[in-house]
Structures are given as structure tokens and as C-alpha cells.
Design a protein with these regions (language model features):
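Hydrophobic alpha-helical transmembrane segments
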Residues: 1-4, 23-29, 48-58, 76-91, 118-147
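Hydrophobic alpha-helical membrane-insertion segments
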Residues: 10-19, 78-102
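Hydrophobic transmembrane helix segments
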Residues: 14-54
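Alpha-helical transmembrane segments of integral membrane proteins
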Residues: 2-9, 52, 74-81, 133-140
Length: 163
């Protein structure tokens, strides 16, 4: 599969995964005290239009990239890729810096309050707190989206420039 096509596929999986973890209760996979999934909030009449709009907005990058891919709009694909790269950078800053160098007191309190009962796939070593499983999968998907898009866009750039 060509990298750009693979990136579109990875983006579809990412968009689907993000919706699933936001809407459905998946036990400890997406358990966060005080933040019930939107599906539960909707059943109890607590989901707002703003909540639904925000979740819909997370599908927009995939739709825009897919449109740009189908029309050959490389500049728009680059903008989309930059957006995904910023999201990935925020994930790295939030999770991996604390895992590699140790959590600040503030992050330690947040982690214990919100993520201590989440599914863990990586070991926790003292103050070196890993991303929970839900975020780890999200980060793997984001990384694949960004890498595949950049490789695909650079490869198509070489082909366009050499013709």
C-alpha cells in the first residue's frame, strides 16, 4: 500500500478509535473519574451540543485529508499533516516527557486522580508514569498517521519535481 493511501487508512482508524473511546464505556480502558463517556452522558441527558460538536470536530481532519487526497491537493494534505503533528507533539509533551524524566508534582496528582485505575500496558517506575493503554494506542495511531503522510507527501514531491 502506498504511504499516502496508508495514511488515509490510518486516519480513518484513528478517527473511529477516538469516537469509540469518547462515546462508549470500555471499562478501565477509558475510565476517567468525573469524565463519563459521551454515550452515558447522552443517555442521562447530560451531553451538550458543544460536546457533540467537539467530537464531530475530531473527525474533520480525516475528512479534509481524505478530500485533499482524492483531489490531489498536496498543500491541504500538508496542512492536515501539520495538525496531526501538533496533536502528536502535545501527546509526547504530556505523556512521554513525564515517563522519561519523571512526573512533576502536579502531573503526579492528576495521574493518580484520573489515570490510576486505567489499563496500563507499560511499567510504572516510581515517578516515571507511562501513558495509559488508551492514550498509548492513540499515540501509536497518531505516529503512524504522521509518518505515513510525511513519507507519502515527500515521495510524491520527488515524483512531481522530477517530471
Amino acid at each position: 500500500m502506498k504511504p499516502l493511501r496508508a495514511s488515509v487508512f490510518a486516519q480513518a482508524i484513528l478517527a473511529f478509535y477516538f469516537q469509540v473511546i469518547q462515546w462508549l464505556p470500555l471499562g478501565n480502558w477509558n475510565y476517567q473519574p468525573g469524565f463519563p463517556p459521551l454515550g452515558i452522558q447522552a443517555i442521562h441527558g447530560h451531553a451538550t451540543a458543544q460536546d457533540v460538536l467537539l467530537m464531530t470536530a475530531f473527525v474533520a481532519p480525516f475528512v479534509v485529508f481524505w478530500f485533499a487526497y482524492s483531489k490531489g491537493l498536496r498543500w491541504l494534505m500538508w496542512i492536515g499533516t501539520c495538525g496531526y503533528a501538533v496533536w502528536l507533539a502535545l501527546e509526547v509533551k504530556t505523556w512521554w516527557v513525564a515517563y522519561a524524566f519523571g512526573a512533576t508534582d502536579s502531573w503526579l496528582r492528576i495521574y493518580q486522580r484520573v489515570f490510576s485505575r486505567s489499563t496500563q500496558l507499560l511499567p510504572s517506575l516510581g515517578r516515571h508514569l507511562p501513558p495509559d493503554g488508551m492514550h498509548l494506542v492513540l499515540q501509536v495511531l497518531l505516529t503512524s498517521v504522521v509518518v505515513l503522510a510525511v513519507v507519502g507527501l515527500l515521495k510524491t514531491s520527488v515524483r512531481v519535481d522530477s517530471t
